[in-house]
Every structure is written in C-alpha cells, then in structure tokens.
Amino acid sequence: MLILNLGAGKQKPIIQDQTKEKPYFLINLDTAYYSTPEPGIIESLVMKWDRKESYISFCNEDAFTFMERTKLIFDRVCIYRLLEHISMDKVLYFIYLLSTITAKGDLIDVIVPNYEKLANMILKEDVNDKGFEAHNILLTTELLNDPSCPHASIWTSARAEYFFELEKRFKINQWATDFEFDGRNIYLRFLAERI
C-alpha cells in the first residue's frame, strides 16, 4: 500500500493504523521539514520497493508542486488539517490533482474543522462562563488562524460533498461530523473514494 500524507507535520495517518494491508510505503509531505530527499529520489525508492517491509519517507515539497509532477499513484492520501488552508479559488484544482494521483477505488482521508459545529458553538456561547477563555481561543484559532497560515476555505459536510463530488471524480462514502482529533472534537472527517 502506498500512502501520501499531505501537510503531514508530525501527524501519523490514522488510516495507516486502520489498514490491514502491510507493508506500506508512507510519504510524509510538508514544507516545514528540514532537508529531505528530493521527490525524484523518493519516486525511485518507491519503484524499487519490494513490498516486504514498511518504509517511511519525508519530503519537503509543496503539495501542489508534488501532485503536479509525481508519476506515483497512491492507494491512500491523507489530508489532515490542511484543506482549510487551500484558498477557495484553488480548491477544485487541488481536488483535480488528487484525482491524478489516485486510481479507481483509492481513498482520500480528510480531516477539517467543521464550520457548522464552530458556528453553533458561537451561537450558544456564554461569555460569562468560566471556560470562556479556552472556548474563545479554540474558536478564534479555528475560524481565523494565524495570518502567516490563514484558513482560506470553509468546510461543512454539505460543502465537502459538493466540491468533492462536483466533477464526478470522487464519492464520499464515510462521514464523522463530530470527530475528535488532536484533543478537540470540532472536526469533520470524511473518506472520498476515487470513482
């Protein structure tokens, strides 16, 4: 199984633990990594991989550039807390690129802030509550984020279905609208299957 973890940071793909297929070759992709093997070298390693044991590689490359240039086809692509940083004018192109690095039946595993849940939290908040400061930090971070890495697109289950299924490349077949990740249960997780 070949897995791509986009915007990986230090997060391990959840789907890696859920798969019964062993061994796997995992490529963690993030521009925050120090020097790493060039994408071409990683592609060569994948081509030579004998599938007898698992292998993990790290790559310092922009997600768009990597997907535009790679010749690899991935069984799984994990996108955890990255998609909301893709601006709306690039979302459909990003999804198109995902379709070019997957084949029929392959899965895209996505975790994004669930803006429907965040909106409800705002509507029901009590500024006099003892936990308001923590509540405010969570909401401000997830809705606005730091200017150096702003959130540039809004995600709800309806929006995810609309954008991923619009061009008939993917079908969302699994949802979790109240998903807990990294200690917070404000996320939307879905699996989009390549069709």
PLM regions and their residue ranges:
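S-adenosyl-L-methionine-dependent methyltransferase catalytic module, highlighting the catalytic core
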Residues: 88-97, 107-195
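Conserved SAM-binding loop
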Residues: 2-117, 190-195
